[in-house]
């Protein structure tokens, strides 16, 4: 289970690293990286605003993944199956909220 925790932590750190350039506005509109929908691709001003917002939410959900991976590891008697599902459910909820809120923000512009 320790190996799985390190995989989750590494994944969270990778997502954190991916979110920082978005937050800092360093990623121009492109077809590979960022919050890519028609509205953001067609309007560079909206691209930077929405990607900053989405990057902040991605950062929060990646930190949520790391915290869940560490804290759930120390629940006594937790099986590896329950641990893996619990971490993914916690992160999945945060990621879903991040995506929905980014769409709502984009639609408010």
Model-predicted segments: where are they?
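Select subsegments of transmembrane alpha-helices in polytopic membrane proteins
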Residues: 51-64
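Cytosolic, membrane-interface loops and tails of multi-pass inner-membrane proteins
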Residues: 28-48
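Transmembrane alpha-helix/helix-exit interface in multi-pass inner-membrane proteins
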Residues: 16-30
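Alpha-helical transmembrane segments of multipass membrane proteins
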Residues: 19, 66-74
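Alpha-helical transmembrane segments
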Residues: 3-19, 87-93
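Membrane-helix interfacial "entry" motifs
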Residues: 1, 42-54, 80, 84
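C-terminal structural segments of small proteins and small subunits
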Residues: 76-109
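Helix-coil boundary and interhelical linker segments in multi-pass alpha-helical membrane proteins
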Residues: 1-7, 73-82
């Amino acid at each position: 289970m320790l190996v799985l925790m390190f995989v989750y932590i590494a994944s969270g750190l990778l997502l954190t690293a991916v979110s920082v350039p978005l937050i800092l506005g360093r990623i121009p509109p492109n077809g590979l990286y960022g919050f890519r929908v028609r509205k953001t691709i067609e309007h560079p001003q909206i691209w930077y605003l929405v990607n900053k917002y989405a990057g902040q939410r991605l950062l929060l959900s990646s930190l949520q993944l790391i915290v869940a991976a560490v804290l759930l590891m120390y629940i006594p008697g937790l099986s590896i199956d329950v641990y893996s599902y619990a971490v993914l459910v916690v992160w999945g909820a945060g990621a879903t909220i991040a995506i929905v809120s980014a769409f709502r923000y984009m639609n408010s512009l």
